[in-house]
Every structure is written in structure tokens, then in C-alpha cells.
Amino acid sequence: MTISVFDLFTIGIGPSSSHTVGPMRAANQFVVALRRRGHLDDLEAMRVDLFGSLAATGAGHGTMSAILLGLEGCQPETITTEHKERRLAEIAASGVTRIGGVIPVPLTERDIDLHPDIVLPTHPNGMTFTAAGPHGRVLATETYFSVGGGFIVTEQTSGNSGQHPCSVALPYVSAQELLDICDRLDVSISEAALRNETCCRTENEVRAALLHLRDVMVECEQRSIAREGLLPGGLRVRRRAKVWYDRLNAEDPTRKPEFAEDWVNLVALAVNEENASGGRVVTAPTNGAAGIVPAVLHYAIHYTSAGAGDPDDVTVRFLLTAGAIGSLFKERASISGAEVGCQGEVGSAAAMAAAGLAEILGGTPRQVENAAEIAMEHSLGLTCDPIAGLVQIPCIERNAISAGKAINAARMALRGDGIHRVTLDQVIDTMRATGADMHTKYKETSAGGLAINVAVNIVEC
């Protein structure tokens, strides 16, 4: 395993990990390289070209604004909503972006060149940055690819996209290898994952970082249920989380088990409404699927006996297990909607959440693997066809539906003994092959499916 749980679960801004978080990181990385090479003092102009899916749905996903902010030195992990909104307004008014926060160049969202019909060989989400000096002399140029979940690569680094590279004690590249490790050492999947994470940091640091991720998830939910009105983008999609919360809180003030599904739906809905509005979320493993893991973790904490006993321990074990399973999807297939459709985003997240819950419910490693397999098997073929290129319809409701699917998958797996006909590895390989066969119009281009069959009249608000 080369991918840390802290690469799969990262803090960023909405609405898209591949179209917002990744491009911001790429732009920032390009500026860091310019500074390192001593080119900033000579910089007079910047050109940005977007290709494929980034160009096709970038406007709805906030790609252009994310790139401008990244060029100014902003990072998705630390940028505040207030700073984002203020700087974008100033850039629009002045026509100037400050590269690295200091060098003014004429560049706005309208100056970014879009090439939706050109798909670069490495990945559908390609972007090229070109820095020019006096007399138009090219100082540097680099092409980056946003490969899903906020991961970015170049043609030279396509095999190492993680933010936390580290040699691990128990490497694996398949679910079978992970199960073999658990058998050999007589450990759970979360324990195996913890041994790998502690190769890079102490156990206390791992636990603290995972609990911080949970806290950010909860903060995201709380912000969302306090907000009303319409989501941005012109589709006039009304926020529902606050209304749902008020009604649920009145009907179920003591959190009775029969209302569990309603609360799970609410958490998923709240997270994805916050994501759709460009708020701070935990990528899990993508922004478009960011509501599933928090919703099922909410269930694990509030509606299981383990959660009643030690919610912090439940959080750590849940996220470690989910991360271990998520790394398999990243390594063996893809978590990018632009590459394999929504099955790679929502399907992967459902499998991760199902695995995490199965472990919390006392599942063996094989039952945990089975839970992930069930959730992914019944997500195969999901298309990514966001209406108007916005991460709203069908994305928000799909997270709630998939959170319920993950819980059901975990419960089904625990009714068995871990022996099952279809393996997780086979399902992951099938997902990759299905994504390769899927027509481009169903892979985050808004050129097919709901995106063209639902009439829209966009009025930007």
C-alpha cells in the first residue's frame, strides 16, 4: 500500500475534489516551482489551458476560480470561505491575479482557455500552465492531471500522486493480500492499517488526526443545517437540510432507533449541500461523494453499541478500515468520475463506509471485505451526468441513497460467514473495465444522461 488514509481523507473546499481541490493544488504547485527556479521576478503573463472534463464542466465545478486562488498561493486545506469570496470579487473587479500572492498579472476566469473536445492521453482532467516573461518568452510550462479525490499528477509523476508518501510495514495492492496479512498476523483490517500509518507518525498522532477529520465532518454538517435558501449556480435547488433537521429534531428529540435512517439521510444531505455551496468538507474519497462516509460514521457512533461505549475509538477504527479499502480503489481502478463515472466516486465511498461499519459491528476481515464488495457490486455502472455541470443533481440525493446502501451492505455481510462468490478484487476490476467502456458523455462532461434530458434555464444568482 502506498496511499495513506490521510490522502484519501483530506480537508478542502467544494464543490469538487477533481475539479476544485486538485486544480487549486496544481496551480499552487506550479507557482512553487516557478519560485524555486527563480522565475517569479521575470513573470509578466500567465496562460492556463483546461482540457476534457475540466473544460466541459469547469464553470459549474468552480475550476477556474480554484485555479486563480491556487496561483495566488491558496491551499484547499487552509483557505477560508471569506478569503475565497473576497479575493475572487477583487480579481473580477481588477482583472489582476497576484501570482504567489505578490506578482500582479492580467488574468481572470474569462482568460482561461477551454478545450472540452481535447482529451489528453494521461487523464480526462488535464490542465496546462504556461508562465511568460518579457517579450512573451516562455519561462516554464507544465501539464497536470487531476485524477480524483484531490490527487494530482504530471506525466512524470503519474505513479505517485499521494500527499503523504511513506514506506509502510504491510504493503498490499489487493484485497486478497490485505486479508492474507490479517490472517498471518491475526489482526483486523483497522489494526493492519494502523500499523502502516504508524510508519509515518506516532499512534497518538494518527488518532488525533483522524478525530480531527471527524470533527471537520461534524462542523460541516452543523454549518449546513443552519443555512437556508438556494444553492449557487442558477439551478434554483433549494437547501433542505435545515428544514429536515428542524422536523426531525421535533419528531425524534431522543434519537430513537426507528429514526436512524432519517438521520443518516440528513447527514449525507447536509454535507453535500455544504459541498455544493463551496464550503469546507472532508474529501471522502471525493467531494462529490463526501456525504456517505460521514453519514455512515454518524450511524456507527449513534446507533451501535460500540459507538455508545467509545465514540472516539469507533471513529478511529471506522476511518482506518474505510481508508484501507479506499486505497484499493485508488490503486487498482479509479475514484475519478471523469475517468470511470460515478461508480468510482459514490461506489467507492459506499464500499469504504460499508467496510468501516462492518468492522464496528464486529465483522471479521472477510466479512468487512464482503461488505465493501456488496456495496460496490451494486454501484456498478453508475454514470456521472451532473445537470448544468453542478455538483447538485443527482449528486446530493445520491449520497443519501448510497449511505443507506452502505449500511445495508454491512448488515448483509454480517449475516454471512465471510465466504462469498464474488470477491472485492473482482468487483474493483469490473468497475475499472466498466468505466473504460463507458461513453465519455457519462463521465463528468454533462453531455449525456440527466444533464441533457432535464431542461434547465440557468439564471445566475
Swiss-Prot record:
Top-level lineage group: Bacteria
Lineage: Bacteria, Bacillati, Actinomycetota, Actinomycetes, Mycobacteriales
Reaction(s) catalysed by this chain's protein: L-serine = pyruvate + NH4(+)
Cofactor binding description: Binds 1 [4Fe-4S] cluster.
UniProt similarity note: Belongs to the iron-sulfur dependent L-serine dehydratase family.
A cellular-component GO term for this protein: plasma membrane
Species assigned in the record: Mycobacterium tuberculosis (strain ATCC 25618 / H37Rv)
PANTHER family membership: L-SERINE DEHYDRATASE (PTHR30182), L-SERINE DEHYDRATASE 1 (PTHR30182:SF1)
Cofactor: [4Fe-4S] cluster
Keyword Nucleotide-binding: no
Biological process terms in GO annotation: gluconeogenesis
Gene Ontology MF annotations: 4 iron, 4 sulfur cluster binding; L-serine ammonia-lyase activity; metal ion binding
UniProt protein name: L-serine dehydratase
EC number: 4.3.1.17
Keywords, comma-separated and alphabetical: 4Fe-4S, Gluconeogenesis, Iron, Iron-sulfur, Lyase, Metal-binding
Pathway assigned in UniProt: Carbohydrate biosynthesis; gluconeogenesis
SUPFAM superfamilies: Serine metabolism enzymes domain (SSF143548)
Enzyme kind, highest EC tier: lyase
Pfam families (alphabetical): SDH_alpha, SDH_beta
